[in-house]
Regions:
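Hydrophobic faces of well-ordered beta-strands that scaffold small-molecule active sites
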Residues: 1-4, 35-40, 78-80, 147-149, ...
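Glycine-rich anion/phosphate-binding loops
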Residues: 12-23, 50-68, 125-132
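Active-site-proximal loop/turn and secondary-structure-junction residues that shape catalytic pockets
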Residues: 8, 41-43, 82-86, 151-157, ...
């Protein structure tokens, strides 16, 4: 089984179309494998949803289309994240055998500037997520697609002025209780 993280699919109009998703699935199947999941769409497909921006409702409509198209293309799982400022890393670290590994050093990362227009509160981010979940979950159920959410990476409280919600088991429990 194959999972693609943010596949390079044309995002005309801020959404993925059915034909491109079917082509991707068929391409994987040509090699005797199964495309089981897509993890993440480009952040600019849903950043206004995460931050309650002026294009939130437009992006929700586009994401509804995208989720429907993923399901209708025969891809059973869609994973996403709630990190509008992406995964954070600091310079790589040398590990056993002299290999280099990705790293995050909070002493460095916590000093980085704001990534968006202002600081956001954790409750704002939860309210935005709740709004999204109550809309997208019934769509996913209707289409027979499963949703997954990526943990905050790194799992620290806040980076660049944006709270990182999924850093604990309690956060996942809170998510499940929304819908």
């Amino acid at each position: 089984d194959i999972l693609f993280n943010t596949p390079l699919i044309s995002g005309d109009g801020g959404k993925w179309n059915l034909q491109d998703l079917v082509k991707l699935r068929l391409r994987v199947e040509q090699f005797g494998m199964k495309l089981t999941a897509l993890e993440n769409v480009p952040t600019n497909f849903y950043d206004h949803i995460m931050l309650n921006g002026p294009r939130r409702d437009e992006q929700i409509e586009n994401m509804i289309s995208t989720v429907r198209n993923i399901a209708r293309a025969g891809i059973p799982i869609f994973g996403y994240n709630w990190m509008p400022s992406h995964v954070w890393r600091t310079p790589p670290k040398s590990i056993r055998g002299g290999a280099l590994a990705t790293a995050y050093d909070h002493a460095l990362g916590s000093k980085y500037p704001l990534t968006h227009d202002r600081e956001y509160s954790e409750e704002e981010m939860w309210a935005n997520l709740e709004y999204w979940i109550k809309i997208i979950t019934p769509i996913a159920e209707e289409e027979g697609i499963r949703l997954g959410i990526h943990p905050s990476d790194p799992p620290v409280p806040i980076l660049g002025g944006i709270p990182r919600l999924f850093r604990s088991f309690a956060a996942y429990k809170r998510l499940i209780e929304i819908y």
